[in-house]
Amino acid sequence: MRSVLVLACLAAASASAISDGMYGTMVFTKDMMVNLDMKMKELCIMKLLNHILQPT
């Protein structure tokens, strides 16, 4: 289960990197994508921490 979360985080990070490159010319869109990317990473980290710390 943990590896699935890691893969999801990697996929989200690479997808945001691709979209960031695509929208690089539009500054407002790029800022929005960066904010979204940061939120996604925070969410992934929190989910991973919760999963690791949770007794199964």
From Swiss-Prot:
Tissues in which the protein is found? Expressed in fat body and ovary.
* Keyword Secreted listed: yes
Where is it located? Secreted
Please give the chief subcellular localization of this protein: secreted
UniProt-recorded Gene Ontology molecular function terms: nutrient reservoir activity
Q: What UniProt keywords are attached to this protein's entry?
A: Secreted, Storage protein
Annotated Gene Ontology cellular components are: extracellular region
Biological function: Larval storage protein (LSP) which may serve as a store of amino acids for synthesis of adult proteins. The biosynthesis, accumulation and sequestration of storage protein-1 takes place during metamorphosis and saves energy for the non-feeding pupal stage. May also be essential for egg formation.
Which protein family is named in the record?
A: Belongs to the hemocyanin family.
Q: What is this protein called?
A: Sex-specific storage protein 1
Organism the protein comes from: Amsacta albistriga (Red hairy caterpillar)
